[in-house]
Design a protein with these regions (language model features):
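Long, low-complexity, charge-biased intrinsically disordered regions
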Residues: 1-222
Length: 222
């Protein structure tokens, strides 16, 4: 059975969408919370086209007792079958829609909702949620509702998301994004953290005063 790419994939927020939430949260003094959903795929519901007549059967996993002539009926989507990511996204989206949330533009994993004049911004990267709202009580209520529907943990204020470190100064109205830890990890993995940087020689014949001429289409001699 051929499975389309849309059935296998899970929509995730683009980097620009994530930065947009923070750019809105900063001047509006929004608090940003981080929620992690536990075993997200098994908390999704099967899609109508999954398996045979809506039921998915599997053979016993390696090392497990195998009775001749028997197969197992899955009760929840598992990682490894074609559509668990899409099933989770569909289930999670249905819940958010039931709470009045609407998609933001072309982003399928970003939502917003206004409750009692308080706007909540939501981003979901599979099992990682970032929730932003200027009112702490409203943010807590929404987060608690999410965790009542899906098993997960409250990780506190968001400090890392989509590979970026997030440093916020609420008083100064400033947010700093950094990937320093990622660059450091790569250098340490390849034993290059303590390497001496190579000295790049500057070409004495190439001077900055030629660039205005290049931009204007004038000839320059090297």
């Amino acid at each position: 059975m051929r499975v389309s790419a849309i059935m296998k994939t899970h929509s995730v927020p683009h980097d620009c969408g994530f930065r947009t939430i923070l750019s809105l949260a900063t001047p509006h003094h929004m608090l940003c919370d981080h929620v992690d959903i536990s075993q997200a795929f098994v908390q999704g519901d099967f899609l109508p086209g999954d398996g045979y007549n809506g039921k998915v059967y599997i053979s016993p996993p390696p090392g497990f007792r195998e009775d001749q002539g028997y197969v197992y009926l899955l009760s929840r989507p598992l990682y490894g079958i074609p559509s668990p990511a899409r099933a989770w996204h569909t289930t999670m989206s249905a819940y958010l829609k039931s709470k009045g949330c609407a998609h933001v533009g072309f982003e399928r994993s970003m939502w917003c909702v206004t409750i009692k004049r308080h706007t909540i911004l939501i981003a979901s990267h599979i099992d990682d949620f970032m929730l932003a709202c200027a009112d702490r009580a409203m943010l807590d209520t929404f987060r608690q509702g999410l965790l009542a529907r899906f098993d997960g943990t409250y990780e506190g204020e968001v400090h890392t998301y989509l590979g970026c470190e997030i440093e916020r100064d609420m008083g100064a109205g400033r947010t700093l994004l950094s990937q320093r830890h990622f660059a450091e990890d790569v250098l340490r993995i390849f034993a290059m953290w303590d390497c001496t940087p190579a000295i790049r020689k500057r070409c004495s014949m190439l001077t900055w005063d030629i660039f205005p001429n290049i931009m204007l289409g004038k000839k320059s001699h090297f």
